[in-house]
Amino acid sequence: MKLIQNIDVYAPQHLGKKDVLIINDKIVKIKDAGSISADGFLSETERINGEGLLLTPGFIDSHVHVLGGGGEGGFANRTPEATMEGLTKFGVTTVVGCLGTDGIGRDICALVAKTKGLNEQGMSAYCYTGSYQIPVRTLTDSIVKDIMMIQEIIGTGEIAISDHRSSQPTFEEFARVIADTRIGGVLSGKAGIVNVHLGDSPRCLDLIERVVDETEIPATQILPTHINRNEMLFGKSIEYALKGGAVDFTGNEDIDYWETICDEVRVCNGIKRMLDAGVNPDRITISSDGQGSLPMYSSDGKFLGMGVGQSSCLLKEVKECVFKTEIPLEIAISTITSNPADILCLKEKGKVEEGYDADLCILDQELQLVEVIAKGNTVYKK
């Protein structure tokens, strides 16, 4: 049992000073500061003084290569697996794992096993079936069955389009993957969403827009990611988001380099531009591409080198939104809490609310992490 007292709550909406009572893995009571007395609780109840601190939902990183990524420059360039400690120390209490370019050296069986392991270790973890490639490599004999029968699988991804590393799928092939994923979600009560990797081809979101325009499949079944890869793609993504589509920014710890070399759009600037254009803030998310390779290629497609994505970028991007572009904290923090929870149908996640999972971050006034709570247990303390 934990009692957090007199803390300024962003749920993500600003609630002001509150007392928050946690029993086991749930938030059971939220009252005005001073309303929940410590008297009468068990002596072992942990009391946390929240004076001068902020409380937010635990962060949701919706795109992490938990098995590691890379390999695009050869076997020596494979990146390491994610660890629970490596995620929670950056405030991530919920992770969604995926495969990328390599769907052979890493497979869905191993991804599901890794996801189960992270859950058993004390955080919340989900995953996608598939990888860049179409036809999709699944654990069972179909996308629908994977989503229906494997608890951890919530959709398909990351399917690559507009990229030289994709399978160059036809419109019909791409639409069928999204249709099957939707049916799997409908039958299982899950999101049934397709996480779509966008490359730097001028075709941008063409295939996605055709699915939305030419079929009965709603835009809510698709989450395009890496939308800030370059200015051209970002401009198209604003247009897509204005039509109601959800969009996912990829955070970056080395944005000063990528902004110059690759025309990448800085997350805080991109979100500000979207908000100014009238995009619904609820349709915007940020993910890290954690443990994924960040390959660099020459103009003729030659591999030049590789970096590794880090979940640390989530809070860094939120800070830049708040302190550089003056986006309200409740909007900035929703991109890594309530928005991904709603878009991915992660029940009882993403909010500081009675009955929700006790996944929480305590921060100071400079938005530095002080403590992280996952499933009611402290998993990081400064």
Where are these regions (language model features)?
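His/Asp/Glu-enriched, well-ordered alpha-helical/loop segment
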Residues: 276-356, 360-363
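C-terminal cap of metal-dependent C-N hydrolases
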Residues: 7-9, 27, 352-382
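Divalent metal-dependent hydrolysis catalytic cores, especially in the metallo-beta-lactamase
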Residues: 82-135, 150-164, 182, 186-201, ...
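Active-site gating loops and adjacent loop-to-helix segments of metal-dependent hydrolytic enzymes
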Residues: 74-77, 81-97, 146-167, 177-180, ...
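Metal-associated gating/positioning segment near the N- to mid-region
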Residues: 42-45, 50-113
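Histidine-rich, glycine-flanked metal-binding segment
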Residues: 1, 9-56
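Divalent metal-coordination and catalytic microenvironments
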Residues: 7, 20, 25, 52, ...
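Active-site core of metal-dependent hydrolases
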Residues: 180-295, 303-304
